[in-house]
């Protein structure tokens, strides 16, 4: 059980490569990643464009950034 498939972890594990935060306290952070067909599992407000495949963005406001999606796969 050491290998986890990339496709399941990409869509389900909350992660973000393009995260922006305000300088307020607490910070207001937004993930600007575009994902195909769905948002990550922790996303409460997911907006998808009506395209094939759908381009989805998570519009949640959090006070932190999720771990980077691409670094996840290499260092575990």
UniProtKB/Swiss-Prot annotation:
A cellular-component GO term for this protein: extracellular region
Keywords linked to the UniProt accession: Disulfide bond, Protease inhibitor, Serine protease inhibitor
Gene Ontology terms for molecular function: serine-type endopeptidase inhibitor activity
Reactive bond for trypsin, annotated site positions: 23-24
Disulfide bond sites: 15-69, 16-31, 19-65, 21-29, 39-46, 43-58, 48-56
Residues marked Reactive bond for chymotrypsin (site): 50-51
Keyword Phosphoprotein: no
Similarity remark: Belongs to the Bowman-Birk serine protease inhibitor family.
Listed name of the protein: Bowman-Birk type proteinase inhibitor DE-4
Annotated organism of origin: Macrotyloma axillare (Perennial horse gram)
